[in-house]
Amino acid sequence: MGKLGWLYCFLIGSTSPAFVCAVENTSVANVVFIFAAMPIFASLFSYFILGEPISKRVKKTIFIVTFGLIVIAYGSTENEISNWKGDLFALYVCVSYAAALTLIRKLKSISILPALPVAYLGSAIILFFFTEPFTGFERNAHLYLMHGVFIAIGTCFLAIGPRYITSPEASLLILLETILAPLLVWAVLYEYPGIWSIGGGAMVVLTLSISNLYVFNKV
């Protein structure tokens, strides 16, 4: 698998506990809005790892998205359900996924799928000694199983997709989660993210959407 393969395993494996820590310490809206910045980090990693140039359009996008993330971070100080610690965990997941997607591009001559169980099983084994994984399992078994199935399918597709499209394009598709997740959590769990999170998140999503629509219209 090589050093890059093991690095991929570490990046992907570490995102699961970091994601849980993010959701536990800040609002779901903050988490997914920060995730929306993944194309930006993917572009940066593609530049440093693959040598792909960063256009003026992307540089402007990076500037505006960074400002949007600052607005979200500020909102965490004004909202009881948000916290900057959770925002940092979400940012780590975002950066790790972007780096992992770029590594898939670099290793596109081989299938990275066999590395996924290594990554997640390794993460699960380590976490087993620090948690109580079977607490409440009987009561919530159906939720555990649904979560496992959805995560497994989504992760496999994420591992396959960047072999055929660029990592920024793959990251862009994840923006659908950014739009749907806060609305579902707000509707079902009544978790209002706060005006700062909504404003900063809207800035991030709209900037990325306009930036990429501009590219698609030129093709």
State where each predicted segment sits.
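Membrane-interface helix-cap regions at the ends of transmembrane helices
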Residues: 1, 17, 66-81, 121-141, ...
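Specific transmembrane alpha-helical segments of multi-pass solute transporters/efflux pumps
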Residues: 1-30, 35, 43, 70-71, ...
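Hydrophobic/small/kink-forming positions within alpha-helical transmembrane segments
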Residues: 9, 13-17, 39-44, 70, ...
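Hydrophobic transmembrane alpha-helices of multi-pass small-molecule transport proteins
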Residues: 12, 45, 57-76, 93-94, ...
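C-terminal transmembrane-helix exit sites in multi-pass transporters
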Residues: 19, 38-60, 179-199
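Helix-helix packing/entry segments at the starts of transmembrane helices
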Residues: 31-37, 104-122, 152-187
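Transmembrane alpha-helical segments that form core, pore/gating elements
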Residues: 42-44, 78-135
